Amino acid sequence: MERCSRCHRLLLFLPLVLGLSAAPGWAGAPSVDVLRALRFPSLPDGVRRSKGVCPGDVAYRVARPAQLSAPTRQLFPGGFPKDFSLLTVVRTRPGLQAPLLTLYSAQGVQQLGLELGRPVRFLYEDQRGRPQASAQPIFRGLSLADGKWHHVAVAVKGQSVTLIVDCKKRVTRPLPRSVHPVLDTHGVVIFGAHILDDEVFEGDVQELLVVPGVQAAYQSCGQKDLECEREQRDGPQTQKPHRAQRSPKKEPARLHKPQSQEPQKQPTESLYYDYEPPYYDVMTTGTAPDYQYPTPGEEEGVLESSPLPFLEEEQTDLQVSPTADSFQAEEYGEGGTDSPAGFYDYTYGYGDDYREETELGPALSAETAHSGAVAHGPRGLKGEKGEPAVLEPGMFVEGPPGPEGPAGLAGPPGIQGNPGPVGDPGERGPPGRAGLPGSDGPPGPPGTSLMLPFRFGSSGGDKGPVVAAQEAQAQAILQQARLALRGPPGPMGYTGRPGPLGQPGSPGLKGESGDLGPQGPRGPQGLTGPPGKAGRRGRAGADGARGMPGEPGMKGDRGFDGLPGLPGEKGQRGDTGAQGLPGPPGEDGERGDDGEIGPRGLPGESGPRGLLGPKGPPGIPGPPGVRGMDGPHGPKGSLGPQGEPGPPGQQGTPGAQGLPGPQGAIGPHGEKGARGKPGLPGMPGSDGLPGHPGKEGPPGTKGNQGPSGPQGPLGYPGPRGVKGVDGIRGLKGHKGEKGEDGFPGFKGDIGVKGDRGEVGVPGSRGEDGPEGPKGRTGPTGDPGPTGLMGEKGKLGVPGLPGYPGRQGPKGSLGFPGFPGASGEKGARGLSGKSGPRGERGPTGPRGQRGPRGATGKSGAKGTSGGDGPHGPPGERGLPGPQGPNGFPGPKGPPGPAGKDGLPGHPGQRGEVGFQGKTGPPGPPGVVGPQGTAGESGPMGERGHSGPPGPPGEQGLPGTSGKEGTKGDPGPPGAPGKDGPAGLRGFPGERGLPGTAGGPGLKGNEGPAGPPGPAGSPGERGAAGSGGPIGPPGRPGPQGPPGAAGEKGVPGEKGPIGPTGRDGVQGPVGLPGPAGPPGVAGEDGDKGEVGDPGQKGTKGNKGEHGPPGPPGPIGPVGQPGAAGADGEPGARGPQGHFGAKGDEGTRGFNGPPGPIGLQGLPGPSGEKGETGDGGPMGPPGPPGPRGPAGPNGADGPQGSPGGVGNLGPPGEKGEPGESGSPGVQGEPGVKGPRGERGEKGESGQAGEAGPPGPKGPTGDNGPKGNPGPVGFPGDPGPPGEAGPRGQDGAKGDRGEDGEPGQPGSPGPTGENGPPGPLGKRGPAGTPGPEGRQGEKGAKGDPGAVGAPGKTGPVGPAGLAGKPGPDGLRGLPGSVGQQGRPGATGQAGPPGPVGPPGLPGLRGDAGAKGEKGHPGLIGLIGPTGEQGEKGDRGLPGPQGSPGQKGETGIPGASGPIGPGGPPGLPGPSGPKGAKGATGPAGPKGEKGVQGPPGHPGPPGEVIQPLPIQMPKKTRRSVDGSKLIQDEEAVPTGGAPGSPAGLEEIFGSLDSLREEIEQMRRPAGTQDSPARTCQDLKLCHPELPDGEYWVDPNQGCARDAFRVFCNFTAGGETCVTPRDDVTQFSYVDSEGSPVGVVQLTFLRLLSVSAHQDVSYPCSGVSQDGPLKLRGANEDELSPETSPYVKEFRDGCQTQQGRTVLEVRTPVLEQLPVLDASFADLGAPTRRGGVLLGPVCFMG
């Protein structure tokens, strides 16, 4: 029974196999058959049929020109599943690395892909760009490009992906995607190709499915193998196999060819397969033959077998269906177990090469299947058993089959079979009635043709094969998307043959809404339904007509506080109240007086070690140290560096003009120059086109609480309130401000002597006294500890040539140089003065014999005389050949400085020398060129106040000063003396440790310490054993010169190499050796006076002896004593360079030399490290008044404060400390001219300044517009003086004020003693602003001042007489509906809208003829619950139903917003005469009249009627105030009910308008300034699109933006979808103006924008340069505000995202972009701009 149970298990799997082989339906899941969706069965271009894995399977051969794609929405209409399985059976061309399936988003981003080859790549990217390119899973060690069939299953679940290959290898990799990943289904699905890649898939594919969930990937293995096993045993059929029977005999059966294809009636013996290796080599479980990738020619005849792992399990008895066609197994060649290249051909008895029946098997015996009778097997003939010949142990050779045996006995009848399949289709029925034509659908919006980069199948032609509804929909969408063109309908094709019976289909997609059916009978009345949900908030309706006055309502909420009433009459004194509860703690009091100085605290903890301080000033040269002992004589050094160029020789005559030399190489890139002056502002450019919409950014963090909103305008005064009940007596008020000094009292008695006062507050720092004499030199300090070794500094700029060093040891002879070009012959130089006598040269050859002289006259014979004098010298002989060069003579005195020679070629970089000691400071050089501006360092210590400088030149007249606060009048006191300096404050608390600083630059060496005693030389240690090779250390100091090496042979000159690329600018090289002498140049300009040379010793003039033979070099003599300085000798010839001398011991620092001549300008130094901030210095003297700064930005207005009750006047407090200046307020409206102010007190005497020139007379300012007429308010008592506000913006010049009273003259101060002129110190960094000094004593009256400026605006005057304007009338009732107006003219065309959504399905085509009725399909499995259908079209109007029962009252809805003002009503009755309006603006100043006569004595002013106390009494209902007739007459006055109603109506409408101003709603009629303001007013709003108007004013220029409240209230402006130029638009597509963007920048503190671009497989992508709105170049290399958010260029296809996040708001938005490698083959695609978001 064990074998039979396996049979049952196998039979249970077979129905699943049948379901799997038909496309959609892995175990019933809603899978997607990608091959069907891409129309593989219709064989598009590049696709043809081939044979699959198992016999009878159909695969598709894909060649290179195939281009297969479909919209993703068509395959996955309900969205792509989160966890899924991707299943495929595929065979690729060997060695191929190509994609199999790729899914792109609407923006062209690759979201999903499977790439086959070595290795296998799985690509995935969700909506948040995760995982990143570096984390994409790669399955290394797997190769699917071997030309064999492979079952591949990919299971994606959660954060991992598993690849299953051939049911054997299973590899899992992490997939770090988002928790809720989403893939965009608005793009396309592409088979076998990438958009940006040329590699395409070539090979065979039999199956490609996408199934939700991961179960299908794990269950596919067993089902696939069982399917192939069934094909092997049963032959190609779709009939369900019968239940297997147990055979009565256990004898293994042989595979025979059936006698007949018809089922035989007589009972026959059942056949059993027996898979034993000796008898049937095809089924061996050994090594299966390798799969060969057939050529196209052999494709039809060869069909590879697949591995059969299931044969290893057990032999299975399975009855063979008698209806199978001929099933043969033939061997070709020497195939089998030992032949790796064997092929097996399974042939079937079909007449056609290919028909659709290959998927279904041969024609089935429907009669047998339907009758339910037992199907008996045919009678078999028993064969003779062949005897296997044993060759070797365990090896068998199969013998030939024996002859057919006799027919066996009839087998027992089989058990009842399962019901057969559906029978053949019946005859064609009569055609049905034509259906009603469907109603036209609504026209769809234009479809998107974003990304369809591949060709699709050809259109038109004969009627194609039967396709599923999904394929038809795909074809329709693809045809529509193909450039949105539709050709004329083709001719009607022939009616196709009826197709074969198909497998049960998967549950279909949701159908479209059907036509409306006929109206059904009216149903019974339903039960009362539950109360519905609260409806959406309706739009505000128009105001209705004014209703009748209602009954008195409940007592309302407390109204707004009214203005303070008039002071009431004094009431009677109340009884003393009970002891009140202790009040809440009072507010913090004002700062008390400074306390006594406490005792000195304990010393604080030692702070952390500070950073290396700045270089100190050079110390005083120390005393000379003790001379050290002479060191041992060192070995001979190696070849020293090339010496400094010698002084040039005498000037040669100018040579002929040489030919122009060849063009030099491009020099290195110069340093960035100083920033130029800003250019003239350009004309404002036109608004650009909007850019592409960016991806939705990730939600940001919630921002900080924003500033308070602007203060609203003051409302109208409310109605006068009823007198309240006497309140509880308030707490004692705070001490008031100090009052003005009263009149001087009478002189008091002499008081008792007071106690000793407290120690006074340290006085301000006095002026520096005269400079004291220089102190004595202090003792030399102890040597400091050895400092830490600094890091190696950067290569410095080459210094100026140093002084000549001592003579060094002679270097070895260098290689001979290349012979130089022979120079032109120079002019003969002047004869040099005689040089010192050289050594005797070799004797020259004998001169030629001179010519014979003329025969002399014979003289008389003289007497023999004595030796006569020498005769005259004979003629000069010819010059002899040049003798060898003599030995170099002794070093001559240095000649005068020659002219500068030509610069030599740069030499090779020498080794790093020893670190030299710091010499004494040299004389100051000339002022060098201005270097680039360094970054501002931290604030240094505050320097001492310098002596007062001489008075400056006459300054320009300053701008008009702001009105100062009124000072307290102090008693005139004598000027006090400067107090002594205060004690030093205590050390502060230890600060928190600072962040670790970067590595500091190498510090300068400190001053030399006293030399230490010389140590005794140590013994030489033994040589250690060689250690392992360590890492390369830092370059050590220069070692002693090594022994001279042997001279190398110069190598042959190599061939000229190819021209290399321009190299990167190298570091500045050391001076090279002198080059060959160049052509003599023209006379240069006169050089500057050089430094005086060292005075040389006078040489002895040697005699000019004959050259002698060279003698041996003698030993080096001891140095002789220095001779006395001789007179300068004659100028000698230029001497040879001496060899480098030994390095001497360091001498003592000499005293500073005299100030030298101005040196050459040095190169600009590198930028120094930022210094530490110094402690705050003492407050300096007040500096001169600086120029007026620009007006600051408008600050936000504060929220309006409620009007408080009038408090009792407090005592005047001490003057408080000066507060920090407040935010600049908005410029106020020009107020009316104030009345003449009271005479101010005499101010402090200022220092006598130089009289300024008279300024030009300004124009009179424009007269202000009269303000709106306000309601007369009750005059309030004068309020307390508020804190001093920030100075407002400079207003227009007011009209000339009356001349002020001349001030009293003040005495001129004495001139102080002139201070000594100090040395000019370095410019210190400006110190922090000191605290405001204490108020000084009142000075003496100043000199007569110029006429004073216009005084401040005085307080508002008393209310004027009533004006003629009446009050606002009552709103009228609603008028009748007007007639519709005439049609207006057509407006201008609107802006281009954004691309629309994908279009709806197009109009239905012409209805074709009705086809033949198809076969009745099998009953499919029950589909899953479909999605809820779309809402149908509205049905016809039903008959009115009966009135239902009264429903349950619904919940009270939210109170709706106030509706807009209603239509103007009809004119009401004429209102009563209104109260007199306020006084108009003051008129212009008239001509001053003559003084009037003295007036009569004054009278008591009666209060105005509005100021008179009103006696009120409350009516019965409390809703009105009934006033006595003596107060105000009734009839429309403010006290009457009609007047109050009108006032309240006006107040309500005003309150709504003010509320909209205070809390804008972000709509087009009520736009906010920024999204930040909107978030502050409405923190509950979600992210979305709202209207903003940054420049306020009229709301017609408001634009729509995206508000990211999640990120704290960012205002995001979208770029326009246009590739020609970058511009920015609102959400409606309208361009955003430059002015609005400027205001948006002013209201923001930072901005950011993302820029992305696609790239393809480059390790170093060319940089993208961006141009900001202020023409700045932005890139990660040039700007610290540009970061690479994601670098996707390292992978095959990726996308690099740059993020520009800058506080320099003028840089954004980005206006242009360029690639450095534009035109490269790897540069594809464009730039995608994200929205620019401003953060307020």
Curated annotation (Swiss-Prot):
Composition bias type Polar residues, residue spans: 258-269
Record domain Fibrillar collagen NC1: where: 1541-1735
A molecular-function term among this protein's GO annotations: extracellular matrix structural constituent
Domain of life: Eukaryota
Keyword list, A-Z: Calcium, Collagen, Disulfide bond, Extracellular matrix, Glycoprotein, Hydroxylation, Metal-binding, Repeat, Secreted, Signal
Main location, first listed in the record: secreted
Composition-biased stretches (Pro residues): 615-624, 1029-1040, 1176-1187, 1388-1397, 1457-1467
Record GO biological process: chondrocyte differentiation; collagen fibril organization; sensory perception of sound; skeletal system morphogenesis; tissue homeostasis
Propiece residues: 1501-1736
Intrachain S-S bonds: 1571-1603, 1612-1733, 1655-1689
Family statement: Belongs to the fibrillar collagen family.
Summary of the function given for this chain in its UniProt record: May play an important role in fibrillogenesis by controlling lateral growth of collagen II fibrils.
Protein name from the UniProt record: Collagen alpha-2(XI) chain
Naturally occurring in which organism (per UniProt): Mus musculus (Mouse)
